[in-house]
Amino acid sequence: WNIVFLDGDWYYIDPTWGDASYQREEGEETPTLTETVNYDYFCVTTQEIERTHSMDDNQLLPVCSAVQDQYYRHEGLYLQSADKEKIDEIFARAAQKGAPMVCFQCADDTVYQEVYRLLIEEQGIFAYLPESETTAAYLDSDRERTFYFWFTEVS
């Protein structure tokens, strides 16, 4: 991973953990490019990176504590609460852009669990499906408190 100085603050970026762009389909010799990029490790704090990465004790590194350029916050994809209006806004912006995927991060475990209950357990995600015949798939990470949703038209 890397440490970068951005807009006057230090951040961690791990592009290798976020690169889901190359996948091999069975029988393919070359990887294919997908449209999914994982932003969980883009401009994160020391506290966030230490949940999944181990640092060498012999390296003197700056403390990364700024959050304003963390991907989800910077892009308005960060939920401070399980606010239905904010969730509606995130899905509406993605639909307006024609994005095949919606992703966002929750501020803490309580918000993550409440959003999980609303969208997954209570099946609230289906309210965001387009009117055409569409299926939804999702990936969530309780460790990173993130959700990724994909919508695919049924052929």
Question: Would you name each region that the model predicts?
Answer:
Residues 1-43:
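Hydrophobic/aromatic-rich core segments of domains that either
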Residues 40-155:
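N-terminal accessory/pre-domain segments preceding catalytic cores
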